[in-house]
């Protein structure tokens, strides 16, 4: 019984540590409320200091607009026919950022928009209220869209 309590405490401490409230690292709900994205250090240094992977979907739809089970949803809008069958959960969404002088702001990265199959240049930064500001754009940040993501973990 004592081991079970210790194991439960270690699990809770690990979950709390992974959220890192003073960091962009953690799990975020996208602005449209359709996806949960885990921001974490990239597996490869060539991919930058922070990468994002889709870890959850809320009410996904298939290519015909009909409801799809989250674990069955695929990247049907991808311009590469070879990637249209890949599962959305587990799919890389954000990569290629460079650090800025602010430890919680990253510039010059990329974000994949699964709704239209396009990749945009992006900047991300942790805001003072704990939300994540993401700006996706083509060419110049002046010509883009800003989204505010909410931390889940």
Model-derived features: positions:
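Sec-dependent signal peptide recognition
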Residues: 2-9
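N-terminal signal peptide c-region/cleavage motif recognized by signal peptidases
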Residues: 14-16
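N-terminal helix-cap/turn-to-beta initiation motif at the start of protein domains
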Residues: 18-27
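Central antiparallel beta-sheet cores of small beta-barrel/beta-sandwich binding domains
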Residues: 25, 31, 36-121
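A short beta-strand motif that forms part of the nucleic acid-binding face
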Residues: 43, 126, 138
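C-terminal terminal-subdomain/extension
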Residues: 121-126, 131-132
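Edge beta-strand at a domain terminus
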Residues: 129-131, 138-153
């Amino acid at each position: 019984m004592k081991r079970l309590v210790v194991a439960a405490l270690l699990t809770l401490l690990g979950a709390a540590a992974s959220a890192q409230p003073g960091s962009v690292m953690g799990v975020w709900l996208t602005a449209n409320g359709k996806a949960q994205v885990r921001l974490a250090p990239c597996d490869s240094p060539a991919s930058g200091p922070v990468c994002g992977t889709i870890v959850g979907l809320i009410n996904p739809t298939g290519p015909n607009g009909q409801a799809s089970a989250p674990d069955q949803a695929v990247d049907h809008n991808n311009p590469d026919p070879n990637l249209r069958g890949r599962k959305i959960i587990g799919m890389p969404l954000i990569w290629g950022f460079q650090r800025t002088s602010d430890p919680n702001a990253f510039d010059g990265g990329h974000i994949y928009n699964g709704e239209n199959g396009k990749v945009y240049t992006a900047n991300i930064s942790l805001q003072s209220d704990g939300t994540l500001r993401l700006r996706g754009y083509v060419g110049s940040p002046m010509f883009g869209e800003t989204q505010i993501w909410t931390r889940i973990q």
